[in-house]
Amino acid sequence: MSAIKKGITLVALSLAGCVSQSPQFAVPDVIRFGQDTFVKVTHSQIDEMQHLLYLPEKSEKNPENWQKGILFFLDKNSKNQTLEQRAAFRQASFAKKPELEAKVEIQQNELHSSVIYPPTERFNNVMLEVTRGRNLACGYGQIQFADKREVGKTLAKKSPNLTAYSQEIAKLSLELNQLGWQVQCSK
């Protein structure tokens, strides 16, 4: 009987070791992007999802009111979603919002998107957002850069021509693609 207990204990310990050895996300505390240095301001987690916000070092670092930011979305991906599934979901979501300009594609095993959001009643700015995402050993990691561009209240109500921002979003997308990959997995 004691041999059975020892065997069960050994199996339980080895399984516990496997669980504790699963890879975890590792991200930097500071990111250099464009002309700015961004520092981690918030880190929240809900179930398997983590959300981190980095704001320029030379800013108020107010997570409720910022103009430029880098966001990380980290998902353990227990549902094993492919990049194609994530791309289809985004395209379907963006299709429901005809007022924005969006592009989603997969390039070299990365999910890329660029979105131009129009001003709203609450926010009088146009937001340019570019993202890169990868499936990793520890889950799905996504890096997003968002830049809010002020527009006057009068222009915000007139629904500005978002295609006027096409060159700027293409430039931001190129800069984000040139940024070294920032999400790693560690044990």
Feature names for model-found ranges:
Residues 115-187:
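Short, well-structured beta-strand
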Residues 58-123:
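Conserved polar/disulfide-associated segments of primarily extracytoplasmic proteins
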Residues 2-10:
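Sec-dependent signal peptide recognition
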